[in-house]
Amino acid sequence: MSQPVTPRRTTRSSASASPSPAPASPTSPPKSRPKPSPRRQLLAAAAAPPKEDGSSADALLAELPGRRAQAMDILRLLAPAPALPLMLHGGAATGKTRALLLALRYLRPSQRLVYAALRSLPSPRALFASLLSQLSATPFSTSSRHRVPDKPSDFVAALRDALNGIVSQGEVVYLVFDNLEVVRSWDKGGQLLPLLLRLHDLLQLPQVVLVYVSSATPDAYYSMTGSVEPNYVYFPDYTVDEVRDILMHDHPNPKLYSSFLSVALKPLFRVTRRVDELSAVLEPLFRRYCEPLGDLKAVPDEGMKRRLFEHVQSHLAVALNETFNVPMRASMDEIKDGGSAGKGSAKRQFAGKDGLSSELEFHMSVSAKYLLLSAFLASRNPATLDAALFDSTGGLDNRKRKRKSSQASMHMKDTIVEEMLMKGPGTFPLERLLAIFQCITSVSEDILDEIDCPGNMASESGTTGLMSDVLLQLSTLCNSNFLSKSRSCPLEGSARYRSNIDEDLALKVARSVNFPLSKYMYRR
């Protein structure tokens, strides 16, 4: 008679006390389990007891090609138990989370990891529940006796109580907030973000180390609260040699894969430097590359390398055109000429005088582009000239009707221009920005009405149908540091803004929407 199998919901202690189940029958197929993601594997490894071998630092550096300096900085800043907060920042897919979790794995003291993947959490309440559940023996939910705090002050109190119980046992707790920039997109995220950055001051627990991982720059989180500033570790983009080392790591046939990367990596690296995107594209290409081979463990000679290259060359061109398709929009000149499509138009766009920068589409809505141009004009032009620049007769085209300026007035204009250059971009209220925005968008609509667009191409290109929620676009531009917002003026009682872009970028944005920006810029 076979022994009973341990039920699924049996606790860990009862399962260890129960007799071991009988071995599975040879005829019964094994149950397939989903393969855990690399990040879950790293989390499990980081939560495991630290290794005691003397080569742990060397093993860590071997697991992180191209990140030796960053790994050493993380170990140096996190190794002592009472450590200041740490922020890892850099572009996407630059190895920030992997370097952190592997470094925590090799830390010597007894430590406990509390990890919050903010990209997978939809709200502050879900974040509170995730952190408190990892620190508590019983999960926090609305149905249990442990209720999730709704207020940030209640959350800080509950978090302090949970951490006190762990710290009192001599453990070091590492609180990791991954993808910190996601908090800004949450409801009331602007209030939660300063709270998370001030947890070191609010908790007052030396054995609790806070680590923030962000794809945004530290300037995006600057606040004047007087809290302790974290230590920063910057992760730059990978070089082509570093990407090659990462892709070659633990490959079963390094010589064959090296010959493949020498053909396919550099063309793809010119388009993207993200390791995850490159890995996703290179995997099917490598299968195509190996199709002429009968044995995948064979080492190709020079003649075989040439034959493999000729076989994969056409597939590599398809991968460049399909996988990394750069979004573009037909210019108004092409609409006037009747439009053009196909490979010929793509070649003309990429072979321009200014290169890619003059033809690539900006990753923002059309209304945001017009709002950015309005802010640039409001910062550059004096407010007293708005009526003359944005009149119904076409702006500065009516200079012929002006009487000749005297020597004194010309000298005064020169003085005003010099003062403007010394002061830099000026500030402006919201009312003036909206007035200029309304004027230049109406000018754009008049230009579109004069062009006979076949097949309604203008509407497809996104030039018409401007978004009505201008305030939301304004907030996005401020968060992206295209605009700066100052405090409310004590006299006017409203906030003032300032444009942070230069004339070259403004002209590129204007060309992308076919707006005559130079016509509305004040020049001496």
UniProtKB/Swiss-Prot annotation:
CC annotations in GO: nuclear origin of replication recognition complex
Summary of the function given for this chain in its UniProt record: Component of the origin recognition complex (ORC) that binds origins of replication. DNA-binding is ATP-dependent. The specific DNA sequences that define origins of replication have not been identified yet. ORC is required to assemble the pre-replication complex necessary to initiate DNA replication.
Subcellular location: Nucleus
The protein, known as: Origin of replication complex subunit 1
UniProt biased composition (Low complexity): 1-19, 39-49
Organism for this UniProt entry: Oryza sativa subsp. japonica (Rice)
Domain of life: Eukaryota
Annotated region (Disordered), positions in chain: 1-56
Family listed: Belongs to the ORC5 family.
A GO molecular-function annotation: ATP binding
